Amino acid sequence: MHCPFCAAVDTKVIDSRLVGDGSQVRRRRQCLECHERFTTFEMAELVMPRVIKSDDIREPFDEEKLRRGMQKALEKRPVSSDDVEMAISYIKSQLRATGEREVPSKMIGNLVMDELKKLDKVAYIRFASVYRSFEDIREFGEEIARLQG
């Protein structure tokens, strides 16, 4: 790593420590030229797969879009924001775990439905009604019956 003080190429690591939950490493470095010390933080860059929409258009994964969709389904429901964030993290880890560069949007929708089903049944029905384009009350009833059965 280049020294931020003199731009020298050679620096050495003096100390390394895990930060927080262990997903980040704090390194204390010293420049071999000017001998100044500085701190860096290192973490793995995890690339999310691209999303293949139903019309075959590809777009980058949008975590905010995922969050908005879940929050809309969970509106005025007794679910903590921590639980929502944990569900989002789980969905993202499942998508990365596929090892694929691209995933169909349908897979994301199914993962969201699975997580909402665990968090809140009403939110699950709300999301499913839009995601599966329920046409009438009968389809709502069938989905509710599946939940209860």
Swiss-Prot record:
One GO MF term: ATP binding
GO biological process, one term: negative regulation of DNA-templated transcription
Keyword Cell membrane assigned: no
Cofactor(s) in the UniProt record: Zn(2+)
Domain ATP-cone positions: 49-139
Keyword annotations: ATP-binding, DNA-binding, Metal-binding, Nucleotide-binding, Repressor, Transcription, Transcription regulation, Zinc, Zinc-finger
Domain of life where this protein originates: Bacteria
UniProt entry tagged with the keyword Zinc: yes
Details of cofactor binding: Binds 1 zinc ion.
Renumbered zinc finger spans (unnamed): 3-34
Family annotation (NCBIfam families): transcriptional regulator NrdR (TIGR00244)
HAMAP family, A to Z: NrdR
Family: Belongs to the NrdR family.
Function in brief: Negatively regulates transcription of bacterial ribonucleotide reductase nrd genes and operons by binding to NrdR-boxes.
Protein name: Transcriptional repressor NrdR
Lineage: Bacteria, Pseudomonadati, Pseudomonadota, Gammaproteobacteria, Enterobacterales
